[in-house]
Amino acid sequence: MISNLPGSAGIQEFGHYAKLLYQALRSSTEFSTYRKNLFQEFIKVGYESIPIIFLVGIFTGAVLTLQTAYQLDTDLYPSTIIGSIVAQSIIIELAAVISALVLAGKVGARISTELGTMRVSEQIDALESMGFNSVSFLVVPRILAGLLMFPILYVTAAVFGILGGITAGAVDGILPAAEFLEGARAFFFESDIIFGFIKSIVFGFVITSIVCFKGYYAFGGAEGVGTATTQATVLSCIFVLLSDFALAAILL
């Protein structure tokens, strides 16, 4: 029996994940079914995440500026190089990755808990018994919201990160805002923004698809929902980091 083979549980779980994605892809054309839920998810995934993204961006940029200045405390480099390093690091890597890891906890936990609770309380079964396509109604809008909102949140994190760097540099007397921006512009390339957008789209899909899968197939009552939520968050973070490495190896 395949179920008795080593690693069979992982193979079966991947099969369920692939099946859910296939059903979601097929159901994505049923816009009238998930239209209302989609706009609600835009608000929950996007608008309600702005405060935490603001804090993450500001302090990431500020700390990175202070640490970069500490490492480059020498006359061998112009002070503008600090702005270059901070801006490049934020745009290419930190704005997308750190935001994704934070959102895996905030957004991912919410989605997996919602779907898991609906599964164990038989609300999903009730939807299907009434003729609703549960995947189209519940899963598709959440994945689409991730795909569309994560790039916007990435830009938000990048902007606030650079502003945080400028502020920290000026307040701490490291370098004036004009010199920071001069350095940032000197090594700015449009391809960096494109790379960041690609990352954010991939991360949005990875996180929302994994947490939807874990929540949708949750079982075992309240304890099972908690387990599914924990697994969803951990797996999302792991696959965000793996996909980050893969994208860097392929695109850079």
Describe the role of every protein-language-model region:
Residues 67-91, 158-201, 205, 209-228, ...:
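Membrane-interfacial helix-loop-helix connectors in multipass membrane proteins
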Residues 46, 50, 54, 94, ...:
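Selective transmembrane-helix segments that form parts of the transport pathway or gating/packing helices
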Residues 3-36:
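Short, membrane-interfacial amphipathic segments enriched in basic
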Residues 45-98, 102:
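Active-site cofactor/substrate anionic-group-binding motifs, chiefly glycine-
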Residues 225, 231-247:
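Final/C-terminal transmembrane alpha-helix of multipass membrane proteins
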